[in-house]
Design a protein with these regions (language model features):
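Short, Lys/Arg-enriched, disordered terminal segments
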Residues: 1-9, 102-107, 182, 247-248
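Ferredoxin-reductase
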Residues: 2-85
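Structural signal for conserved beta-strand scaffold positions within catalytic alpha/beta enzyme cores
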Residues: 17, 58, 157-159, 211, ...
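FNR/FR-type flavoprotein reductase catalytic core
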Residues: 73-216
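Local cysteine-cluster metal-coordination motifs and their immediate loop/turn environment
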Residues: 119-121, 192-193, 214-239
């Protein structure tokens, strides 16, 4: 049974370990089992401050982790916490990434694209797709914003300023890579301008496409309506949407 299944009451969890991933980015590890599908999210509660949705970026049989970029009051306070401190966890919630029949059991050609802190949404997905030997592309503004770059043996890095990896964006090489690998599906999470370019590319080449969208979420279960986007509740219908849903 998933002990975090409560919709409205967070379970207080002790931070087991904290990893400094890169400049301004930390991962918080919890030694508990989580029944989680890649692309779902958990609501993280900092008592007396706020509650925010965060992707699960580490997952094993007996622990899970979330990765947090410091960029506001909530995350700044989160970054002051130390092992032994507690956070409230609700979830997991939402519709995650799917695995079509044509890529199951190591079949099919797969590409995963992460941009900036969106990389946290696709890490568990990448690990689940290891039998497919996926193409992994990661982009960030500068080298100091790249995290998880040493987590995978085969990963192509991009930076806007050329400080590490290829200067430019992951979308710059999609045409060349698709001509070589013939992708059956491309998964992505990151800045919407990047995901929009991947969407257009997949639509043009008739490639299956799934993207994780970021919206302000308050309840996580489709009640408050804060995350509605064109009639879709991102917390419940998403945060992952396929090409057909986004086309509509």
């Amino acid at each position: 049974m998933n002990e975090f299944s409560s919709f409205d009451q967070p379970v207080m969890m002790k931070i087991d370990k904290i990893i400094d991933e890169s400049n301004g980015t930390k991962s918080f590890m919890f030694r508990h089992k989580l029944d989680y599908n890649p692309g779902q999210f958990v609501m993280v509660w900092l008592p007396g401050v706020d509650e925010k949705p965060l992707a699960v970026s580490y997952l094993s049989d007996d622990f899970f982790g979330i990765t947090v970029l410091e960029r506001g009051k909530f995350t700044k306070l989160l970054h002051t916490m130390v092992p032994g401190d507690q956070l409230g966890i609700r979830g997991p919630f939402g519709h995650g990434y799917s695995f079509p029949d044509n890529i199951k059991n190591g079949k099919g050609s797969v590409c995963v694209i992460g941009g900036g802190c969106g990389m946290a949404s696709v890490t568990v997905l990448i690990e689940k797709l290891q039998d497919n030997n996926p193409t992994i592309l990661m982009g960030a503004a500068t080298s100091t914003s790249l995290f998880f770059k040493n987590r995978y043996k085969d990963i192509t890095l991009f930076t806007d300023d050329g400080s590490e990896g290829i200067k430019g964006y992951p979308t710059d090489v999609l045409e060349e890579l698709h001509n070589k690998n013939g992708y059956d599906i491309i998964y992505t999470c990151g800045p919407e301008i990047m995901m929009s370019k991947v969407f257009d590319f997949c639509k043009k080449h008739n490639i299956q496409f799934e993207a994780s969208l970021e919206r302000y979420m308050k309840c996580g279960i489709g009640v408050c309506g804060q995350c509605v986007c064109d009639g879709q509740m991102v917390c419940k219908d998403g945060p992952v949407f396929n090409l057909q849903a986004l086309s509509n």
